[in-house]
């Protein structure tokens, strides 16, 4: 009976150790995927932000050049 208990304990132990190792590797893989997703999302957000800034600067530049042109015409006329 003691032999069966030890054998059962050994089988359970040998089965649980690899299972816990697999679970920790799985969690590490999921964490890496989440980090990659977060980084790609940050890149997309940064790209959208820069695009918006570029559009705004282009609009401001056009308004400034129009106003500057009007001032030059008024000064010459």
From Swiss-Prot:
Propeptide: 23-42
Residues annotated with Glutamine amide modification: 76
InterPro entries membership: Frog_antimicrobial_propeptide, FSAP
Tissues and organs where the protein is expressed, per its UniProt entry: Highest expression in skin and to a lesser extent in brain and intestine.
Pfam families: FSAP_sig_propep
Transmembrane segments: none
Main subcellular location: secreted
Subcellular location field: Secreted; Target cell membrane
UniProt keywords, alphabetically: Amidation, Amphibian defense peptide, Antibiotic, Antimicrobial, Cleavage on pair of basic residues, Membrane, Secreted, Signal, Target cell membrane, Target membrane
One cellular component (GO) term of this entry: membrane
Keyword set includes Secreted: yes
Biased amino acid composition, Acidic residues: 30-40
N-terminal signal peptide: 1-22
Stretch list, region Disordered: 24-45
One of the GO BP terms on file: defense response to bacterium
Family membership: Belongs to the frog skin active peptide (FSAP) family. Dermatoxin subfamily.
Protein function: Possesses a potent antimicrobial activity against Gram-positive bacteria B.megaterium, C.glutamicum and S.aureus and mollicutes A.laidlawii and S.melliferum. Less active against Gram-negative bacteria B.cepacia, P.aeruginosa, S.typhimurium and S.meliloti. Probably acts by disturbing membrane functions with its amphipathic structure.
UniProt miscellaneous comment: The sequence shown corresponds to the dermatoxin isolated from frog skin. A variant of it is present in frog brain.
Protein name: Dermatoxin-B1
